[in-house]
Amino acid sequence: MKNLLAGVIDIHVHIGPEAFKQRKYTEYTLAEEVQAAGAKALVMKAHVFETATRAQLAQPHFPQLKLFGGIALNQETGGLNASAVKAVANLGGKVVWLPTLFARHELAQKGLPGGISCFEEGSTEKMSKACEDVLEAIAETNMILATGHLSVSEQVAVVKEAYNLGIKHILVNHPALFRIGMDVKTQEKLLKYGVFFERNYGGSRLPESSVFEKHFAKNLADIRALGV
């Protein structure tokens, strides 16, 4: 059977230990398996800590695999923090994920208050100064902007502003995930901004659940409508 992982670059793999849940892999155990499978590179992600240093420390032990990290701008990492973005860039980080588990949109869907929004307080369309500063830092450091778990309206606003700022690499995270649910018409509108869409295997509906809702059918339909 052909090795399906040979030459693969996976840009979304979670590592632990995480503060709120158990992860299957650390950077070392993950890299060991992936290098043995013949993959080319990994981008390691965590919700509550930056992963650039973890990638940097593990890299010498896996010469046949390229390891990268970044930062998710949740409360635990300082939120919408342009200084953190620049620091992680200096540590070799490649990806900045806008708020994920601590996004206001995410918490609202769980019936919880608070959270981080890219809009000004009380607005549903005006971008906050903190978010603008983060986008400017991403443009300055040439990192990849990932849209995280923001609402669809926030993601659209962020993509437009990122494009205007000259951010070269914009990744729309898992549009099929039930907490985001970006329809194909919205995705089509974003194509003119040169975005990439992340088509994930699936996603859990409950934080404590190990049963994933598979996205194959939705991903295939969106790819057929929009292209790869």
Describe every region a protein language model picked out:
Residues M1-L65:
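An N-terminally biased module of ancient metal coordination in phosphate/nucleic-acid-related enzymes
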Residues Q22-A31, G78-V88, D183:
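Short, acidic/polar
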Residues R54-I71, A130-T141, I223-L226:
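Alpha-helix-loop-beta-strand connector modules within alpha/beta enzyme cores
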Residues V95-V96, A137, V158, N164, ...:
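Active-site-adjacent C-terminal substructures of enzyme catalytic domains
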Residues G7-V13, L42-M44, F68-I71, V96-L98, ...:
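Hydrophobic faces of well-ordered beta-strands that scaffold small-molecule active sites
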Residues A52-S117:
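Divalent-metal coordination cores built from histidine and acidic residues
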Residues I15-K24, V95-V184:
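Divalent metal-binding pocket/active-site signature
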Residues Q35, H61, A89, A139, ...:
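Anion (oxyanion) recognition and catalysis
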